A protein has these predicted regions:
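Short acidic-hydrophobic surface loop/beta-edge motif
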Residues: 31-43
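Short, surface-exposed, charged amphipathic helix/loop patches that serve as local interaction elements
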Residues: 2-7, 40-157
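Low-complexity intrinsically disordered segments
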Residues: 1-30, 151-157
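Extended hydrophobic/Leu-rich segments
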Residues: 17, 21, 36-38, 112
Length: 157
């Protein structure tokens, strides 16, 4: 076996520690972001940038969109998960993954919210994006967040 873990990654020249710290900064790294363009017909209406979400963010969003029910075994037991509001979950996922500067400019625009009659950024997403557009954005967020990514090489003997 010739593969030995060293203190330096030969591909990047980074030390192991530098590599770990670089990997940990994925949410704030513009190289990990992607621009989403919203167009109708031939006209580009607006664009915004999305970033990867970490697993805790995804779990928190799911919890916020889940209705919890009393445990049938009694009040002394933890509540159980009921129905997940998938429409709200998808909107909140887009909202959370939008880069903060773009979120403030687009989804949290007080004037746009007032004119569309909504109170929150997640509601703006429901008003502005069509179902298929939301689906496409969610796919990109999941891809940026590493879902479906191949993160290791398989060793063959």
């Amino acid at each position: 076996m010739n593969d030995v873990i060293t203190d330096v990654n030969p591909d990047s020249g980074l030390s192991i520690l530098e590599g770990i710290l670089t990997a940990a900064g994925f949410k704030d790294d513009p190289d990990c972001w992607e621009r989403i363009n919203i167009s109708r017909g031939d006209e580009r209406l607006f664009s915004f940038r999305i970033r990867p979400l970490d697993e805790q963010e995804v779990a928190d969003l799911r919890r916020q969109c889940t209705r919890f029910l009393p445990n049938p075994n009694g009040a002394g037991y933890p509540r159980i998960e009921g129905e997940v509001n998938l429409v709200r979950l998808r909107s909140m996922k887009i909202y959370a993954a939008t880069v903060p500067d773009d979120r403030a400019l687009i989804w949290d625009s007080a004037e746009a919210q007032q004119r569309l009659g909504v109170m929150r950024g997640e509601d703006m997403i429901d008003c502005v994006l069509m179902a298929g557009e939301k689906d496409a954005v969610i796919e990109r967020i999941d891809a940026l967040s590493g879902y479906g990514a191949r993160v290791f090489d398989t060793l063959k003997n």
